[in-house]
């Protein structure tokens, strides 16, 4: 073996890394052993030899591992194929339907209500020969600006809603007698009498006008109604749950019962039947014993409960009152409270610390509490006659809670029924239009919210029912207008509280990202790294393939 070949083999074994050095000065030992020029020539020979040997080794390894690499690539490819096939399935199963909605009509619904919600009560003056006074009154009505949402009309012929009866008297006064509007007035000329009649009509209808106005201002951002009547009325709904509860104090050790069925039949059902066309009232009853008594103090040898202690009393009683499972059915509570004998007779005080004669307190948007001073040792049953006066108070409170603000009696006259009918129509239309506007804002603000076909159908039904209600009002058909307005309210509520929309609100896009990231990040990162590695291997194999196809020099 020649010294040159021996030296080459020695350097390959001991100093293999020298062949990769680009600068000759780094090969310090070789330069001083055989000289600079010979070392340079020798290193070039070694470098080509090493590269040739490494390519041979890689080619041999590639040939040996080719089946294994192919299997590895097929396995990796299968993962990507599964992912690509799963994407359409995932998209189909998680994609939400977003139907188009008439946003312009929904956003303009409140202003449309203010424009089209017009009540037109009609009158006829009795004993008006030649209809001269009727024409004068109609002229005055047309000359004066109409009050908000009301357009009074005086007609010459029937049918009309009300009749005006003029009676000569020294004093001016007016009052209702069923559908007759009676005016006692001194003798005047036609022009003066026409102005007087119009003033009396607007004075009679001003409470109704204020009630409708308060409904509109409740949804206004600039005007906030401060009327106590507005704050007292219960939340609007086509149906209510009326809960009659007899709560017996903890000091009463004798069982007390009441003849509630006969009492309801005699004293409460007539009013419920009159209200049936306006709202459905579902009556329930209960008796609760050993109820914690109210806080009482002695005043003039009487036990009294302060007005400031009533909130605590209500909170205490609510523990014993059953709740309705229906969210859209507000509950009106009427509590008859029998205190313990130790604090009887117990009287409730008003805000001025005066004893309330009826011993009953009306609580806004909740109901009322009535205290019954009942000697249990002498009598253990409340007969229907004993409950008569209490039901008179309950009936009056029910009308107040439903929105009839100046109720003189506990019954519902024809005039009060019409008044409440108009009020319910206004409430239904205003609530439905406000719900549509809120729904439009909600859908606009949440682009990922699902809007199924059902919601689209509910919205269209609401708009159609509102239009039909306005048309019925223009024809002065209150019963038909109430039916359409109630349907509009129900459909709007079903659209706003649709289950698909509620779930979307509680599961926004941020929650989806929080769920997907922990699941797919640990899978995708190794797949991505493996993909990059396989790409590098494929590029290296192509390079080796090109080198292998280069012809060797002879």
Curated annotation (Swiss-Prot):
Gene that encodes it: gpi17
Stretches in topological domain Lumenal: 95-511
GO CC list: endoplasmic reticulum; GPI-anchor transamidase complex
Protein name in the entry: GPI transamidase component PIG-S homolog
Glycosylation sites: 132, 375
PANTHER family from the UniProt entry: GPI TRANSAMIDASE COMPONENT PIG-S
Residue ranges crossing the lipid bilayer per the database entry: 74-94, 512-532
Superkingdom, taxonomy of origin: Eukaryota
Stretches in topological domain Cytoplasmic: 1-73, 533-554
Keywords: Endoplasmic reticulum, Glycoprotein, GPI-anchor biosynthesis, Membrane, Transmembrane, Transmembrane helix
Membrane topology, from the record: Multi-pass membrane protein
Assigned protein family: Belongs to the PIGS family.
Primary location group: endoplasmic reticulum
Pathway: Glycolipid biosynthesis; glycosylphosphatidylinositol-anchor biosynthesis
Function, as annotated: Component of the GPI transamidase complex. Involved in transfer of GPI to proteins.
Pfam families: PIG-S
One BP annotation, GO: attachment of GPI anchor to protein
Subunit structure, as described in the record: Forms a complex with PIG-T homolog, PIG-U homolog and GPI8.
Subcellular localization: Endoplasmic reticulum membrane
Keyword Transmembrane helix found: yes
């Amino acid at each position: 073996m020649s010294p040159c070949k021996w030296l080459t083999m020695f350097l390959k074994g001991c100093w293999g890394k020298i062949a990769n050095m680009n600068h000759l000065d780094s090969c310090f030992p070789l330069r001083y052993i055989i000289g600079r020029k010979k070392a340079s020539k020798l290193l070039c020979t070694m470098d080509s030899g090493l590269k040739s040997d490494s390519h041979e080794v890689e080619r041999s390894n590639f040939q040996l591992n080719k089946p294994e690499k192919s299997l590895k690539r097929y396995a990796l490819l299968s993962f990507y194929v599964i992912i690509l096939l799963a994407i359409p399935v995932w998209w189909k199963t998680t994609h939400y339907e977003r139907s188009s909605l008439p946003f312009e009509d929904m956003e303009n619904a409140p202003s449309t209500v203010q424009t089209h919600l017009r009540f037109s009560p009609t009158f006829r003056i009795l004993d008006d020969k030649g209809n001269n006074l009727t024409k004068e009154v109609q002229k005055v009505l047309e000359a004066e600006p109409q009050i908000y949402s009301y357009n009074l009309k005086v007609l010459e012929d029937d049918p009309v809603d009300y009749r005006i009866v003029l009676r000569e008297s020294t004093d001016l006064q007016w009052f209702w007698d069923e559908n007759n509007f009676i005016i006692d007035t001194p003798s005047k000329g036609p022009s003066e009498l026409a102005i007087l009649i119009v003033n009396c009509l607007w004075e009679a209808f001003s409470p109704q006008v204020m009630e409708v106005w308060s409904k509109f201002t409740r949804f206004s951002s600039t005007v906030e109604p401060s009327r106590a009547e507005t704050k007292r009325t219960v939340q609007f709904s086509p149906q209510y749950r009326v809960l009659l509860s007899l709560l017996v104090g903890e000091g009463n050790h004798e069982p007390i019962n009441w003849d509630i069925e006969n009492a309801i039949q005699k004293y409460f059902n007539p009013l419920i039947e009159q209200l049936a066309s306006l709202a459905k009232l579902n009556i329930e009853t209960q008796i609760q014993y050993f109820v914690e008594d109210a806080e009482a103090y002695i005043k003039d040898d009487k036990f009294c409960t302060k007005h400031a202690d009533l909130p605590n009393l209500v909170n205490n009683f609510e523990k014993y009152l059953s709740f309705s499972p229906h969210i859209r059915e507000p509950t009106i509570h009427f509590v008859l409270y029998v205190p313990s004998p130790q604090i009887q007779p117990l009287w409730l005080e008003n805000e001025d610390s005066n004893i309330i004669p009826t011993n009953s307190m009306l609580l806004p948007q909740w109901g009322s509490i009535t205290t019954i001073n009942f000697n249990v040792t002498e009598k253990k049953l409340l007969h229907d006659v004993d409950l008569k006066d209490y039901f008179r108070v309950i009936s009056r409170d029910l009308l107040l809670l439903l929105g009839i603000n100046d109720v003189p009696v506990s019954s519902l006259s024809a005039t009060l029924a019409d008044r409440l009918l108009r009020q319910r129509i206004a409430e239904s239309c205003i609530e439905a239009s406000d719900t549509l506007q809120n729904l439009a804002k909600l859908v606009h603000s949440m682009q990922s919210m699902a809007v199924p076909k059902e919601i689209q159908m509910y919205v269209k039904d609401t708009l159609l029912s509102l239009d039909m209600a306005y048309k019925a009002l223009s024809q002065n058909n209150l019963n038909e207008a109430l039916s359409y307005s109630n349907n509009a309210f129900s459909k709007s509520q079903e659209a706003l509280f649709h289950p698909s929309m509620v779930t979307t609100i509680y599961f926004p896009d941020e929650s989806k990202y929080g769920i997907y990231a922990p699941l797919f990040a640990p899978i995708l990162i190794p797949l991505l790294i493996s993909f990059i590695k396989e790409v590098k291997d494929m590029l290296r194999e192509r390079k080796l393939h090109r080198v292998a196809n280069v012809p060797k020099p002879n």
